[in-house]
Structures are given as C-alpha cells and as structure tokens.
C-alpha cells in the first residue's frame, strides 16, 4: 500500500497551462503532477513544448505487452460529461434541446475557440445518429416553436447537401448555427456554475461540466436547489449534453 501527503490547487479560468509553463522554467519546479481534461490543449501547450511527460505504471505496461518507455500517449483517467442546466428560480422551462437555441435565449458556454472539445461536440451533431435526434426533438415541438426554427432549417438545407450530410443534416446545421450565434461566451465552466446557482440568475441556462456542482457551497443566495439538469426532467427531448 502507498501513503502520500500532498498539497493541491485548482487554477481558475484556464490558467493551468500558463502556471505549468512558468513552473517548468524554474530550476526546481513546484508541481509534481497535474490532471487536465482538455486533450487538445495538453497536446499543443504541454506535450509539444516538452513541458509534460506521461506517467505509465510499470505493472500496467507489462500487463499490456509494452514498457513505460515504449508507450506513447497519455492514460485517460476519467470521462467528464457536459450537460445542459438551467436556473429554476423563475418560470422558464427547458424541455427540449431546441429550447436552448430559442429566441432570446443565450446559454452560458465556454468559448469553442478556447476549448476545442466544445467545437468537436458541434461537429459531432452532424453525424447521422445525432442529427436524427435533433430532427426527432424538433418534431416534438409545438407549432409556434417549429415556425420559428423552420426558416433556419430551410436555409441550411443547401449547406447540408454541399457537405454531404445525411437526410437530417439541415437540422444539425440549424441548431449549430443558432447555438454559435447566441451563446454567452465564458472563460471557464466554474464561473458558469457559480452564476447559475445564484438566486439572481433567474431562467438563465448553460452547458457545463456536471461535476462542477460538487464545488457549490450553500449560502445566502446560492444553492444547488436553484439549478436543474435539463435531461433529468420528465419528458425532456433531444440532446442532453455530451461526454
């Protein structure tokens, strides 16, 4: 068995890369290990410059027919889920993934140019299976909401054909277009969570890492009771998030 005493910290607003880069320039660094969830930025900002090295346990390598020195890449430790959430202190209801791109709705979201996994999510929606889910969710809307989205879907039909997408590709492109044009750009999921759990964030919504809820501390004006996960609500239709 192993026992270790250690100190840890959690940089905010995506500053972890700057902090580790500065630490690597010291004669004797402060940090011995890091856990980062963004594989794209790990590769571009940490691996290519030679700041981080992978740790491969000897026993794991031997069990998989290799050695620590020969293994390339990093071992994934966890899978995180980003889900649609909304502040429930008001009257707004988000029962369909199209509600998050409806008129006047501006969900809080980490900018897709800051976190590439968010951009990958949007690309993913054009795959036939997920585009079909968006079509089914659209079909479940009432006539008023359908009428609002229909012109955008029709507008995207030519692009969907030019891109070689499947029969429901226009629905995916329409949802993506509306999302990108209307989301409220944020620097990190932490501040998004901190906003949504307040009494004052009435009817606001966001797409963020589910685990951020664990760091919420109950206080006057701040509570987990102020936030709901959309996909957990009865009758929810469509995409609930991504992992």
Predicted regions and their residues:
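A structural signal for short loop-to-beta-strand junctions that line the ligand-binding cleft
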Residues: 18-25, 29-34, 53-85, 97-98, ...
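Periplasmic solute-binding protein
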Residues: 38-50, 68-95, 113-130, 238-243
């Amino acid at each position: 068995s192993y026992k270790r005493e250690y100190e840890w910290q959690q940089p905010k607003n995506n500053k972890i890369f700057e902090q580790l880069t500065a630490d690597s320039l010291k004669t004797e660094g402060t940090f011995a290990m890091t856990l980062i969830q963004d594989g794209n930025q790990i590769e571009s900002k940490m691996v290519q410059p030679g700041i981080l090295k992978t740790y491969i346990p000897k026993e794991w390598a031997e069990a998989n027919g290799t050695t620590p020195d020969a293994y390339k890449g990093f071992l994934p430790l966890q899978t995180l889920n980003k889900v649609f959430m909304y502040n429930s202190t008001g009257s707004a209801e988000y029962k369909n993934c199209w509600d998050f791109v409806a008129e006047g709705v501006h969900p809080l979201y980490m900018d897709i140019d800051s976190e590439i996994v968010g951009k990958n999510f949007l690309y993913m929606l054009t795959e036939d299976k997920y585009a079909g889910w968006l079509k089914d969710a659209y079909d479940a809307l009432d006539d008023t909401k359908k009428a609002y989205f229909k012109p955008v879907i029709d507008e995207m039909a030519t692009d969907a054909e030019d891109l070689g997408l499947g029969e429901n590709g226009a629905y995916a492109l329409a949802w993506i277009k509306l999302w990108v044009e209307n989301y409220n750009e944020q620097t990190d999921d932490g501040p998004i969570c901190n906003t949504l759990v307040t009494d004052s964030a009435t009817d606001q919504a966001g797409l963020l890492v589910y685990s951020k809820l664990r760091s919420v501390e109950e206080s006057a004006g701040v509570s987990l009771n102020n936030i709901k996960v959309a996909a957990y609500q009865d009758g929810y239709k469509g995409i609930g998030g991504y992992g």
